[in-house]
Amino acid sequence: MENNVTTISREELEELREAFNKIDIDNSGYVSDYELQDLFKEASLPLPGYKVREIIEKIFAVTDSNKDGKINFEEFVSLIQELKSKDVSKSYRKSINKKLGITALGGTSSISTEGTQHSYSEEEKVAFVNWINKALQDDPDCKHILPMNPSDASLFKSLADGILLCKMINFSQPDTIDERAINKKKLTPFTISENLNLALNSASAIGCTVVNIGSQDLQEGKPHLVLGLLWQIIKVGLFADIEISRNEALIALLNEGEELDQLMKLSPEELLLRWVNYHLANAGWQKISNFSQDIRDSRAYYHLLNQIAPKGDDFDEIHVEIDFSGFNDKNDLRRAECMLQQADKLGCRQFVTPADVVAGNPKLNLAFVANLFNTYPALHKPDNSSYDLTLLEGESNEERTFRNWMNSLGVSPYVNHLYSDLSDALIIFQLYEMTRVPVDWTHVNKRPYPLLGGNMKKIENCNYAVELGKTKAKFSLVGIAGHDLNEGNPTLTLALIWQLMRRYTLNVLSDLGEGEKVNDEIIIKWVNQTLANANKKTSITSFKDKSISTSLPVLDLIDAIAPKAVRQEMVKREDLSYQDKLNNAKYAISVARKIGARIYALPDDLVEVKPKMVMTVFACLMGRGLNKIK
């Protein structure tokens, strides 16, 4: 046990980041030694004062690598790893169980080792059950499992046939899954497994990290994995419109003297915080800087609700009166309950209980606020038309696909904006490692960057990223320099990202094909051979072949790899209109995911025959075909 170093998952990392940010109130990127005890408490690892003092004396010598008496996030994570790996892990396990609302389970899966602690939050379970019950209450396909009981474990059982997960993915990101591909009646273990594959591969395609989750885990209803996946899916839906190109009224949140492109770089979380503060300023109330500590007394929420509640000014609008009578209640829980009763008048009593508000649960309070924003943003787009409207075009399908691909692999932090979030190349280095291009991390500048010269540090990273691409990855990067990545030059950035995605896809194929190098020619040859062997009439000459716009070569290939997966009555083969082609493409991509191909491409990519994305579709299907042979 002494030598075991605990690995920390991305989800845990996000929770540690949440805890760190709560204590790092001034956003300096550091916490001081005297704040360490609070930090452990926030990280679900409360330790007595003497223990913290011992740690400060002993471990600071090792962990505080730059000896500045402060700890940055990386140092904190290594400290947590150290603690969880040693004797303290015993008390850690006990303390995590005692933490309010935490249910702990021992490790039971073949992957998890003996003694691992998988805890899950009772509050999250209750919140997600209520959200799903409301979201899918009118769906006839879910009548057999809804409504679920928030106070028992029915959530974990209800996900077992895959239908609920598929439905929630479509609720968060409409049209991701073609309903015709979901198995709904007379389910068998095989058709259930297909549904779960469809859900996992579709979740991946909308940017959820599913690296450590298998269909078996979902079938067994492993709580920590189920809740982790559900939170990602729900968050995609909650954040979908908190984006300026999709909601121009957010321009109202520009600060004095701020440029629009600065506002566009903010994450949905940062935009939500700014939205709340915009309304609090109008109410004459003090700003908040987080969705945990600062909202625990519910008073900011009272003012927010009062600002966004319909005033009845418009012809078809009914006035909603926010009752402040509970505002001065001495009891925090009672005050929170009164506030939530006001939220209920807006149809927004979701995600949090009074206890979640008072405890400052950051995840659930964030969801509560996002739902308020989506229901009553109460923003008016400024009349001033002096903004650069080209900035408001939003991301292309290709950009979104690349971003979802990165996020599904678990890069950290999450990529919200393809260009600005890659401007320091840290995400690109992670992608290099995932594509087996070695990165010398001693050459990489880490966050937080100094105020003075910070951009220079980012450009140094970008220069190294381009150098790695040319020398180690052997990519074609003619005319690309570090400053192009730093400035977010779309064409040149996409050229690098495409080569990373292509390499990643081909690596998967090479692994299945005994290490043989794979190229376009080999994929096309395999596709045509497989189609011919199954007596199919379709074939392709290249990834630009116009026949691909019908999706028939894709559907026939799926049928050749997994007979009976395609229901032929769903496929239109003659006299195809544009809509027919689109329907075929939607069905093809969903069925491909259902048989186990992790496809990121969109139906439009097939209809419009986008060669890059078409290549990934056939490569993923080839991977599935080779896997079957093995």
From Swiss-Prot:
Listed GO CC annotations: actin filament; actin filament bundle; brush border; cytoplasm; stereocilium
PTM notes: The N-terminus is blocked.
Binding-site list for Ca(2+) 2: 64, 66, 68, 70, 75
UniProt cross-references to Gene3D superfamilies, sorted A to Z: Calponin-like domain, EF-hand
Subcellular location: Cytoplasm; Cell projection, Stereocilium
Region of interest (Fimbrin headpiece), ranges: 1-114
Region Actin-binding 2: start-end pairs: 376-624
Domain of life according to the entry: Eukaryota
Limits of the Calponin-homology (CH) domain: 122-238, 266-377, 396-505, 517-626
SUPFAM superfamilies: Calponin-homology domain, CH-domain, EF-hand
Presence of the UniProt keyword Nucleus in the record: no
Renumbered residue ranges of the record's region Actin-binding 1: 108-375
Binding site for Ca(2+) 1: 24, 26, 28, 30, 35
Keywords: Actin-binding, Calcium, Cell projection, Cytoplasm, Metal-binding, Phosphoprotein, Repeat
PROSITE patterns hit by this protein: ACTININ_1, ACTININ_2, CH, EF_HAND_1, EF_HAND_2
UniProt cross-references to SMART domains, sorted A to Z: CH, EFh
BP term (GO), one: actin filament network formation
Domain EF-hand: 11-46, 51-86
GO molecular function annotations of the record: actin binding; actin filament binding; calcium ion binding
Region feature (Fimbrin core): 115-630
Oligomer and partners: Monomer.
PANTHER family registered for this protein in UniProt: FIMBRIN/PLASTIN (PTHR19961), PLASTIN-1 (PTHR19961:SF27)
Function: Actin-bundling protein. In the inner ear, it is required for stereocilia formation. Mediates liquid packing of actin filaments that is necessary for stereocilia to grow to their proper dimensions.
Protein's name according to its UniProt entry: Plastin-1
UniProt organism field: Gallus gallus
Lineage, highest ranks first: Eukaryota, Metazoa, Chordata, Craniata, Vertebrata
